[in-house]
Regions:
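Flavin-dependent oxidoreductase catalytic cores
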Residues: 1-102, 106, 110-117, 121-122, ...
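Rossmann-like dinucleotide/flavin-binding elements
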Residues: 21, 96-127, 166-180, 188-197, ...
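Short, contiguous acidic/charged loop-to-helix segments that flank catalytic cores in large enzymes
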Residues: 89-91, 96, 137-149, 209-216, ...
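Local beta-strand N-terminus motif with an aromatic residue
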Residues: 26, 181-182
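Glycine- and other small-residue-rich loops at beta-strand/loop junctions that grip anionic moieties
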Residues: 6-10, 31-34, 165-168, 229, ...
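N-terminal Rossmann-like dinucleotide/flavin-binding domain of flavoprotein oxidoreductases
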Residues: 133-179, 273-282
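Residues within well-ordered alpha-helices
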Residues: 16, 41, 111, 154, ...
Length: 282
């Protein structure tokens, strides 16, 4: 039967896709999400500019399930221009400015790359010792390792565009004034909240999801109550259970000497998370 066969589903690497066709395993490969992350993927592939392709992180953040069902516009965590291509055209500057970006997380890195590629003189200050910010914690969670590719790609683009980095550099009013930039972008991220407003919370040892994901704290035994039932909370619960029994499939509940309970105000866990990610996590 002479029926063309196409394959689809999480094939993010164009070289792998080409290999499937060249070996005669399929007649073609359909790529959806990778073209949201980088609409110029086919053009870059034809020009052998594989390092310039922005990789899809397979996060399923807003490309599968729209955030607002009343305005079902597809979005992309990696490419914020999706749906706004004509709102923010790429225009190289004819008046380069000295730009200081405080913070080397995903937001700071993307801003740095965008400004530098437009021709500005960009410097990034990061109080830590590496780029990535909270993305370094996100990729620790099971199934999120592909997000590392985006961070590696941002670093590649930043270096190619001439972005300068200073690590272990904390911004103050004084040293920012001394640096004398034309523009300052604050991209310092967020800090986890300790709910001191909850009566009696001070009677128990309280940690944050960051403490668990960063391995700053491990919980080999005991009873754990996680306040919140969003994606990060569920991933944290899974990691605690996985640590309790490393060689087993971890689910929330009780394993050995560890018992985890999630407390959520919404009627269900992981409200607003795309259905495939939610089903896998739960």
């Amino acid at each position: 039967m002479n029926i063309p066969v196409f394959v689809v589903g999480k094939i993010n690497d164009v070289r792998y896709a080409a290999d499937l066709v060249e070996r005669g395993l399929v007649d073609g490969v359909s790529m959806g999400r990778p073209l949201l992350a980088d609409p110029d993927l086919p053009k870059k592939a034809l020009e052998n500019r594989f390092d310039d392709i922005t990789p899809c992180g397979s996060c399923g953040g807003r490309c599968i399930t729209p955030e607002d069902p009343h305005h079902p516009v597809c979005k992309c965590h990696i490419n914020p221009l999706v749906g706004h291509e004509y709102d923010f055209p790429f225009n190289p500057t004819d008046k380069p400015r000295k730009v200081l970006i405080i913070g080397a997380g995903p937001g700071g890195m993307y801003t740095a790359v965008t400004a530098a590629e437009r021709g500005h003189d960009v410097t990034v200050w990061e109080k830590g010792k590496q780029i990535g910010g909270q993305l370094n914690l996100a990729v620790v969670s099971p199934g999120k390792q592909e997000m590392c590719k985006w961070l590696t790609h941002l670093n590649y683009r930043a270096k190619k565009a001439g972005v300068k980095f200073e690590f272990k550099k904390e911004a103050t009013v004084e040293n920012v004034k001394e640096f004398a930039p034309d523009a300052v972008v604050v991209a310092t991220g967020a800090t986890p909240l300790i709910p001191t407003f909850i009566k009696g919370v001070g009677d128990y040892p309280v940690i944050t999801t960051h403490d668990v994901l960063s391995r700053k704290v491990t919980i080999p035994k005991g009873t754990v109550c996680i306040l919140g039932g969003g994606e990060v909370a569920c991933e944290t619960a899974e990691m605690i259970m996985a640590d309790a029994r490393p060689n087993s499939f971890a689910t929330t509940g009780s394993i050995g000497d560890v018992e985890v309970t999630l407390v959520e105000m919404q009627p269900q866990l992981m409200t607003g998370v795309c259905l495939p990610n939610r089903n896998i996590a739960l």
